[in-house]
Amino acid sequence: MATAASSITLTVLMGVLLVGVVAVLARLEDWRSYTPLSDVGGGLGERTGYTHEEKPGGIIRWFTTVDHKDIGILYGVYGTIAFAWGGVSVLLMRTELATSSETLISPSLYNGLLTSHGITMLFLFGTPMIAAFGNYFIPLLIDADDMAFPRINAIAFWLLPPGAILIWSGFLIPGIATAQTSWTMYTPLSLQMSSPAVDMMMLGLHLTGVSATMGAINFIATIFTERGEDVGWPDLDIFSWTMLTQSGLILFAFPLFGSALIMLLLDRNFGTTFFTVAGGDPIFWQHLFWFFGHPEVYVLVLPPMGIVSLILPKFSGRKLFGFKFVVYSTLAIGVLSFGVWAHHMFTTGIDPRIRSSFMAVSLAISIPSAVKVFNWITTMWNGKLRLTAPMLFCIGFVQNFIIGGVTGVFLAVIPIDLILHDTYYVVGHFHFIVYGAIGFALFAASYYWFPMVTGRMYQKRLAHAHFWTALVGSNATFLAMLWLGYGGMPRRYATYIPQFATAHRLATVGAFLIGVSTLIWLFNMATSWREGPRVDSTDPWDLEETDQFTNDWAWFRAKEETTVLPDGGDEAQSEADAVTDGGQPAADSDTES
């Protein structure tokens, strides 16, 4: 009874919080966080005639802001917290797996950490962190004042904190067992677990899905209607193309996932039989889940592809090779991603003729990805490479993406998948993509845009130490997982036979290297934001030399050179002030240019 009362109380509190957030944000037009300028942004979506107050000070600013840049920072902070939660979870798991027997944590806690890690990294870190960069930079890249629906933008973010609390409720509320379903929530296991943490996790996933859907609508409307007069479709940058495609995928995938979650909740709590053996079919859940789940992989990877396609040419001294083909391949991936879901189900006994068709489409979707890899490598070929931190992470992205992609092609072949299904090979392949590729692209973006966001430069040596530690750690961990998979080690087990101990210990060492690299990144970002040397140029990457000075950096130049900022009327910091107030030019410090 106490457990039921605790879950009901938490649910009521979350509902009250959501109602309060909606009520407050619905009255925020007078608190709008920017004042449109006639010479900065505008175009098709220019909003003239508005007069808005300046931003309130302190914490009130962050609770009431509807400025796309502030919301982008909120998404970034939220994603970083989620990344820390998921990272600590996996380090506990890998510490347990350093030995073949149970030593540190119980199998039930291991399963709870496994579930929390997967859902946190995919739904609370991956999608929100991409939204962070999209919110901050898409309006700048397309020369818009703000997102098309600023208040909806704020609501979409504020749905995420209660969603995270619900998802993590099994760890936060004493007396209830953690959800132990893995991130796939396969039936009948997810039906038979009696813990209310499973229901609260599903409600939290609903909130994250609604948030992502609202954000997708906003990105589509912004890119279609808010572009500047000089930004036509042929002029649209590659990051905006990938965000547009991603948003389309979200609109088709996430509502279906929400419907499947409702059916699962009804089965668990109201006696329906959608996924039970008695009246429905447990395999039906897998069809619904993977129809969402595989497009979700591309929801996560397409914007990082766009980030790499945007940043890599800047430090290659050449424009992106085959820009149109990169766009076409992005759209092709978006279409094909909905036709491959059953390759996750080759072992479930589906009709062999259906399996063959899904194998063919799964092999076909590798072609547009290969086009992108070819274009990235060709862009660097004979280029004047500058190995700054953003460029190093882009190169690391390409390397990890090739390994993750090639190992995925093998899994698309039915006879091979029947052997490797549900082994550590699948885990290694997937993590080469979700951390080795997606994570590296997000790190590249954080370094590339850091001077624009903060007006300061990060520390070069720390950034390079971050890269090499992350590269070595990720390859040690995920190559060891591929090795384990070839040996037949199944996934999702806290104990194993001793013959797998060496590979598991290597993976554990690599995981801790990844943890150290992340701490280096956090320290670099935090200290450089507060006391890093101010950039002495509005073109810190010398993009004008190669004719790659884009709209986002034009906004940064306008902000630095005008006395009124587009985000609230504060006085701008001139270049002279940047030198006389104690900052040092980036060229004379331990920073990159």
Curated annotation (Swiss-Prot):
Gene name per UniProt: coxA2
Crosslinked residue numbers (1'-histidyl-3'-tyrosine (His-Tyr)): H294-Y298
UniProt xrefs under Gene3D superfamilies: Cytochrome c oxidase-like, subunit I domain
Full protein name: Cytochrome c oxidase polypeptide 1
Keyword Heme included in the entry's annotation: yes
Function summary: Cytochrome c oxidase is the component of the respiratory chain that catalyzes the reduction of oxygen to water. Subunits 1-3 form the functional core of the enzyme complex. CO I is the catalytic subunit of the enzyme. Electrons originating in cytochrome c are transferred via the copper A center of subunit 2 and heme A of subunit 1 to the bimetallic center formed by heme A3 and copper B.
GO biological process: aerobic respiration; electron transport coupled proton transport; oxidative phosphorylation; respiratory electron transport chain
Record: residues binding Fe(II)-heme a: H117, H431
Annotated TM spans: 5-25, 71-91, 122-142, 154-174, 204-224, 246-266, 288-308, 320-340, 358-378, 401-421, 425-445, 467-487, 506-526
Magnesium listed as a keyword: no
Coiled-coil regions listed in the entry: none
InterPro entries to which the protein is assigned, alphabetical: Cyt_c_oxase-like_su1_dom, Cyt_c_oxase-like_su1_sf, Cyt_C_Oxase_1, Cyt_c_Oxase_su1_BS, Cyt_c_oxidase_su1_bac
Sequence similarity: Belongs to the heme-copper respiratory oxidase family.
Location in the cell: Cell membrane
UniProt GO MF annotations: cytochrome-c oxidase activity; heme binding; metal ion binding
Disordered: annotated segments: 562-593
Main subcellular location: membrane
Residues reported in the UniProt entry to bind heme a3: H429
Chain sites annotated for binding Cu cation: H294, Y298, H343, H344
Reaction(s) this enzyme catalyzes, per UniProt: 4 Fe(II)-[cytochrome c] + O2 + 8 H(+)(in) = 4 Fe(III)-[cytochrome c] + 2 H2O + 4 H(+)(out)
Pathway annotation from the record: Energy metabolism; oxidative phosphorylation
Organism: Halobacterium salinarum (strain ATCC 700922 / JCM 11081 / NRC-1) (Halobacterium halobium)
Membrane disposition: Multi-pass membrane protein
Domain of life the protein comes from: Archaea
Known EC number: 7.1.1.9
